[in-house]
Design a protein with these regions (language model features):
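Conserved small/polar residues in nucleotide/adenosyl-binding loops
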Residues: 291-300
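Conserved phosphate-binding catalytic cores of ATP/NTP-utilizing and phosphoryl-transfer enzymes
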Residues: 36-60, 165-188
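Nucleotide/phosphate-binding catalytic cleft detector across ATP-hydrolyzing
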Residues: 1-47
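Glycine-rich phosphate-binding loop and adjoining helix at the ATP-binding site
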Residues: 84-185
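Glycine-rich phosphate-binding loop of actin/hexokinase-like ATP-binding domains
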Residues: 182-239
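Active-site core segments that coordinate phosphate-bearing ligands/cofactors
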Residues: 218-271
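Hydrophobic "anchor" residues
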Residues: 81, 138, 205-206
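Gly/Thr-rich phosphate-binding beta-strand-loop-beta motif of the actin/hexokinase/Hsp70
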Residues: 47-82, 190, 195-200
């Protein structure tokens, strides 16, 4: 996926003999995965052929399963995004019906793309919480099934699935094709409804001894009695996270503090972090002051 190159360059890069490389590349050309782009200009001597990936040969699908929405995309071999959907309303619950909702969302999105389903090589699924990509299991959701979540999705959708934690997936994306692509070691801080860290060490995702390195939001940090989603008290996430802001804003509205979010709270009986950010942009005093106090600021 490094772009265009000659057989000689492939031989040096992969440490494979010229006859073997020639045979393998020709097989890929015959399968319409690689394209012969013609001769490359050289100062002298025989001009070699240059080869590149055929964008329409293989596709990759991805889905981010969030706590309250899902995001989908389809890319080609050159990482060009062919189609994406970022506003699929969804509530992540530990119920079988939720798996069905995930699967139907994936299938409907792929169908709407209008591409050959058989050309989708893999489906990357990232989600919040503790995830083991080797076993394909989530240790927070859908734990009652004997089958792993990965196997359940593969069986239902019919495409090879890779399951990964959402923060680690974002970290690896930044490392491979983002602002950190030229770095060997990367530390990625995700602050959304939760707080977590993704780590790349010497070009590899770091999982730690437990396999769950990066659960930064669940470090005991505060002397409070707030129970975190992990079951412990005083985690960083109980005070500094989107969830913490939501909970505290709801509490203030219940106490009668003036805010333009009051009507929405009365309708929904809850407030989402996006609602608070929108209200802050509209100069709602409570939202402005509270997000400023809760969210971290740059300190010297």
């Amino acid at each position: 996926v490094n772009g265009e190159c000659t057989l000689s360059e492939l031989t040096k890069e992969l440490h494979i003999s010229v006859p073997t490389i020639t045979k393998l590349v020709q097989e890929l050309v015959d399968e319409n995965i690689v394209t012969d782009l013609g001769k490359v200009e050289t100062p002298g001597g025989r001009r070699p052929n240059i080869f590149g990936l055929a964008n329409s040969a293989i596709y990759f699908a991805g889905v981010n399963v969030g706590r309250d929405n899902m995001r989908f995309l389809i890319t080609d071999l050159q990482n060009n995004i062919l189609k994406e959907e970022n506003d699929f309303t969804f509530e992540l619950l530990d119920r079988p019906q939720c798996i069905e909702r995930i699967c139907s969302g994936i299938e409907n999105f792929i169908a709407a793309c209008g591409i050959d389903r058989g050309k989708i090589l893999g489906l990357g699924v990232c989600m919040t919480g503790r995830v083991n990509p080797d076993t394909g299991r989530s240790y927070k959701y859908f734990t009652s099934s004997e089958q792993s979540l990965r196997d359940l999705l593969e069986e239902r959708v019919g495409i090879r699935v890779l399951l990964e934690n959402d923060t680690r997936a974002r970290c690896y994306a930044e490392y491979t094709c983002g602002k950190s692509k030229d770095e060997s070691n990367v530390l990625y801080l995700h602050m959304g409804r939760g707080v977590a860290i993704g780590i790349v060490v010497d070009g590899q995702l770091y999982y730690g001894k437990s396999g769950f390195a990066g659960e930064f939001g669940h470090i005991p940090f505060f002397d409070n009695e707030i129970i975190c989603s992990c079951g412990k008290k005083g985690c960083l996430e109980t005070e500094v996270s989107g969830i913490a802001i939501e909970d505290k804003m709801c509490h203030l509205i219940q106490k009668g503090v003036n805010t333009i979010l009051k009507e929405k709270y009365d309708q929904q009986k809850t407030i989402h972090i996006d609602d608070i950010i929108t209200a802050a942009k509209n100069d709602d005093n409570l939202s402005v002051s509270y997000t400023h106090l809760t969210l971290p600021t740059n300190r010297e």
